[in-house]
């Protein structure tokens, strides 16, 4: 059980709170879990609007969009953000700071520079050196060294950290509320020979095009197959590039609620994750497993690891639509084998439940707080001020 000694915990989310994403979900779920356990939690995050923010979230200002790791990240950086970060730290009286993705230009990096004392950094990114954009290296290393402890959400994220910054981390996976998905209801409209996909489907690295390229071969074996796509995006633009004879079997659902997602994952014949890269964990895979879904995913390192190298789900060669089609056909042809693997995956998914994951994170917090220090403001550094474009009187 998590210790009942109440702590004041500051968590920094680097990405815009209003934009759906794995890091935002992780931070929000962790904050709510810690609050329910009796701790005082404040989350600092960029936000497009102060309206409808949870009570525990403090806006650091409006984010801007930058390309990052094959996607668009909405982050906040610069002298005004630095001042807001310092103010939040000075008012927080925190026992520990938990900074997510402190190695990219964001408020997490600013908080790492601005604070002294117990600080834990969680690293989510997984990418090859040439594909990832970390902050300016001369400023990074001394900042990252200030972290008392480091967490990576997967072995893939840990390897990225070791490769880029030559430092190590404890692996603690992302968490899910497994019971929410375990109790999903089977809905006939999504069941049968159906393929499910959830994500920002117009983002190339999410891989929807690979699933659609596999579809003709799948249809030739299973003429009744239907594809259901949930998530934000322009469905009309996507339908335009799909063969006309296939369009009537592809259904775009738009955004769905958490309850609908649990039912969707419970119901679909196969859940397909054809992502091409840039994934360090795969929360949606853990949620799908917890729902009892039969998962087919690309063999990128994070997905392959999460699926136990094929024990809890099926992998196909990344970006190979023909291999994906073969795997789908084989699974639809052998329902008993498919369901047996899904049953194992559902049991395994309990290891990602917040009851387990939050306990591990709090163990890291305790290690960071072992010296008894509180979080305080560091003195402003003139070279950092110069980097931010502030007046240094030089």
List where the protein language model places each region.
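Carbohydrate-associated surface elements
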Residues: 156, 175
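A short, well-ordered alpha-helix in the C-terminal region of glycosyltransferases
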Residues: 323, 330, 337-351, 363, ...
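Nucleotide-activated donor-binding/catalytic signature segment of Leloir-type glycosyltransferases, i.e.
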Residues: 239-262
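Conserved donor-binding/catalytic core segment of Leloir-type glycosyltransferases
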Residues: 187-206, 212-216, 228
């Amino acid at each position: 059980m998590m210790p009942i000694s109440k702590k004041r915990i500051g968590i920094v989310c680097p990405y815009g709170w209003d934009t759906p994403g794995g890091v935002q979900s992780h931070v929000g779920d962790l904050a709510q879990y810690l609050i329910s356990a009796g701790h005082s939690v404040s989350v600092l995050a960029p936000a497009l609007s102060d309206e409808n923010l949870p009570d525990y979230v403090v806006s650091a200002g409006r984010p801007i969009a930058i390309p990052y790791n094959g996607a668009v990240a909405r982050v906040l950086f610069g002298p005004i953000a630095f001042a807001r970060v310092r103010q939040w730290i000075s008012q927080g009286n925190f026992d520990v700071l938990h900074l997510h993705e402190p190695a990219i230009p964001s408020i997490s990096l600013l908080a790492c520079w601005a604070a002294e004392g117990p600080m834990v950094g969680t690293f989510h990114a997984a990418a090859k050196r040439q594909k990832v954009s970390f902050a300016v290296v001369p400023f990074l290393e001394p900042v990252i060294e200030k972290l008392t402890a480091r967490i990576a959400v997967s072995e893939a994220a840990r390897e990225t950290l070791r490769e880029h910054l030559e430092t190590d981390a404890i692996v603690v996976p992302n968490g899910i509320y497994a019971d929410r998905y375990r109790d999903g209801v089977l809905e006939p409209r999504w069941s049968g020979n159906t393929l499910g996909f959830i994500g920002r489907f117009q983002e190339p690295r999410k891989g929807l095009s690979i699933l659609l390229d596999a579809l003709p071969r799948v249809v030739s074996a299973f003429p009744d197959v239907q594809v259901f796509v949930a998530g934000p995006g322009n469905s009309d633009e996507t339908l335009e590039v799909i063969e006309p004879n296939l369009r009537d079997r592809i259904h775009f659902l738009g955004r769905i609620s958490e309850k609908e997602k649990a039912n969707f994952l419970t119901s679909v014949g196969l859940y397909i994750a054809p992502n091409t890269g840039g994934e360090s964990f795969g929360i949606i895979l853990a949620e799908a497993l917890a729902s009892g879904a039969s998962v087919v995913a690309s063999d990128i390192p994070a997905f392959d690891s999460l699926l136990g190298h094929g024990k809890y789900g099926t992998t196909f060669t990344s970006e190979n639509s023909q291999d994906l089609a073969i795997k789908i056909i084989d699974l639809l042809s052998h329902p008993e084998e498919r369901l047996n693997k899904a049953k194992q995956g559902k049991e395994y998914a309990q290891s990602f439940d917040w009851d387990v994951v939050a306990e591990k994170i709090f163990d890291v917090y305790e290690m960071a707080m072992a010296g008894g220090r509180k979080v305080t403001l560091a003195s402003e550094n003139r070279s950092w001020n110069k980097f931010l474009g502030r007046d240094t009187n030089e």
